[in-house]
C-alpha cells in the first residue's frame, strides 16, 4: 500500500509525475492542467490519476475537498510554466506572479508535509532576483523550510543539458538531500545523441519510418524501448529546398555563421540553423525542436529537423509514452516537460526524506 499521496500542479504531460509514479510508496491522486490536449495526454499515461482540467484559480477549497474526499495530500509537486522571462512585460509578470500565489494558496489549503517546486533557471535572475526571493518568502510564511538547487538533467542520464531550479519545502525540519550526479566526469559517461537516437532509422525531410534500425545496444535504449515493439511519431518535418540545402551543408555542431555566404540566412541568432553534435548530449530543447530557424535542432547524421519521437527521447520519455493533439501541441508537451529520468532521481530522494520523518 502506498504511503504518500501526491498532487501534481501545472502537470503538463506528466514528466514530473513520472518519477513518483514509478515508486510504489507514492500514489498520485490528482493532477491539474489547464490545456485540454495536454490534460488528455497526461491521462493517457497516468489513467488512475484524477485529472482536473481547469484554471488553477478555479480549484477552490470546496472543489479540492470534493475530489480528494477524506484523503490527505502528503506531497505537492509542480511548477508554473515560465518560458521567455526576458520578454515578459509588467502585466505578464503580474500574471506569472499570480500563478505562484495560486500554488501557495493550494499549499495553504492542503497543508502537505512537503512540496517540490520546479522551474527554469531564469527564475533566479528574473526581475533582478526579486521574484524568487518573494516566492521563497511566501512559502516560508506558511511554515515551510526551504532548500533549492540548480540541477542539470544531463547529470542524471538524460541526453540533454537542461537546467532546472528544484525548490523543496518541508513543514518543520527539511532533511531533503539532492540526488548526486550519476553521469559526468569520473562517473558514467554522458548519454550522447548517438546513444539516445542512433537506433532510429535514417529519414529525410517529410519521410516517416516507425521501426527500429538497430538493437537496443546501450542501457538508455533498453530503458526507452522496454515496453515497445515499434516506435511511433518518427516523422521528419517537411522543409523547403533552401532549408534542406542549408541543413545538408552544415557539419556536426556547426551553425549559420559557418555557412557559405550565398546560402547563409540573413537573420537569426547564433544557435539557429545549427546542427547538434552526434557524440555529445543535446543542448536544451524547447517546443521549437522541429524549427531550425528558432533553435539548434538539426539532426547531425540525417541533416533534417528532429522528429517528435527524437524530441521525446532527448527528454528521456520512453517510447510507449503517449502525446496528444496536433504536431505543434505534441512538441509543446515535450519541450515544456521535466525529463522523466530527472524526476525519478528527485522522487527517490524525496521518499528518503519523507521516510526520515516517520
Protein language model regions, located:
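Short, Lys/Arg-enriched, disordered terminal segments
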Residues: 1-4, 356-358
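Core alpha/beta nucleotide-donor-binding catalytic domains of modification enzymes
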Residues: 2-111, 121-125, 130-133
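Class I S-adenosyl-L-methionine
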Residues: 62-70, 83-265
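Short aromatic/basic micro-patch
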Residues: 79, 114, 305-308
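C-terminal target-recognition/interaction regions appended to catalytic cores
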Residues: 216-358
Amino acid at each position: 500500500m502506498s504511503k504518500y499521496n501526491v498532487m501534481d500542479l501545472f502537470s503538463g504531460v506528466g514528466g514530473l509525475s513520472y518519477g513518483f509514479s514509478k515508486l510504489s510508496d507514492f500514489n498520485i491522486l490528482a493532477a491539474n492542467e489547464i490545456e485540454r490536449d495536454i490534460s488528455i495526454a497526461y491521462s493517457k499515461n497516468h489513467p488512475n490519476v484524477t485529472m482536473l482540467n481547469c484554471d488553477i484559480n478555479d480549484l477552490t477549497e470546496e472543489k479540492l475537498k470534493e475530489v480528494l474526499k477524506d484523503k490527505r495530500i502528503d506531497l505537492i509537486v509542480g511548477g508554473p510554466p515560465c518560458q521567455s522571462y526576458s520578454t515578459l512585460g509588467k502585466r505578464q509578470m503580474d500574471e506569472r506572479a499570480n500563478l505562484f500565489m495560486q500554488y501557495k494558496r493550494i499549499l495553504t489549503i492542503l497543508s502537505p508535509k512537503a512540496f517540490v517546486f520546479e522551474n527554469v533557471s531564469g527564475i533566479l535572475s528574473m526581475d533582478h532576483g526579486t521574484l524568487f526571493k518573494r516566492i521563497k518568502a511566501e512559502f516560508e510564511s506558511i511554515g515551510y523550510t526551504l532548500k533549492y538547487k540548480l540541477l542539470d538533467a544531463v547529470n542524471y542520464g538524460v541526453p540533454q543539458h537542461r537546467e532546472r531550479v528544484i525548490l523543496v519545502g518541508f513543514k518543520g525540519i527539511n532533511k531533503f538531500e539532492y540526488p548526486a550526479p550519476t553521469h559526468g566526469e569520473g562517473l558514467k559517461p554522458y548519454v550522447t545523441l548517438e546513444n539516445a537516437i542512433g537506433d532510429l532509422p535514417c529519414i529525410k525531410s517529410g519521410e516517416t519510418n516507425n521501426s527500429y534500425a538497430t538493437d537496443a545496444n546501450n542501457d538508455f535504449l533498453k530503458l526507452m524501448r522496454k515496453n515497445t515493439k515499434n516506435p511511433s511519431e518518427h516523422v521528419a518535418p517537411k522543409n523547403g529546398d533552401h532549408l534542406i540545402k542549408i541543413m545538408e551543408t552544415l557539419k556536426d555542431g556547426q551553425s549559420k555563421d559557418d555557412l557559405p555566404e550565398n546560402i547563409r540566412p540573413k537573420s537569426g541568432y547564433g544557435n539557429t540553423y545549427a546542427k547538434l553534435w552526434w557524440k555529445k548530449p543535446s543542448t536544451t530543447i524547447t517546443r521549437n525542436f522541429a524549427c531550425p530557424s528558432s533553435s539548434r535542432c538539426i539532426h547531425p547524421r540525417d541533416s533534417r529537423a528532429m522528429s517528435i519521437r527524437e524530441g521525446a527521447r532527448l527528454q528521456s520519455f520512453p517510447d510507449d509514452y503517449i502525446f496528444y493533439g496536433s504536431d505543434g501541441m505534441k512538441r509543446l508537451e515535450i519541450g515544456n516537460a521535466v525529463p522523466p529520468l530527472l524526476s525519478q532521481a528527485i522522487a527517490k530522494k524525496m521518499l528518503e526524506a519523507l521516510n526520515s520523518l516517520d
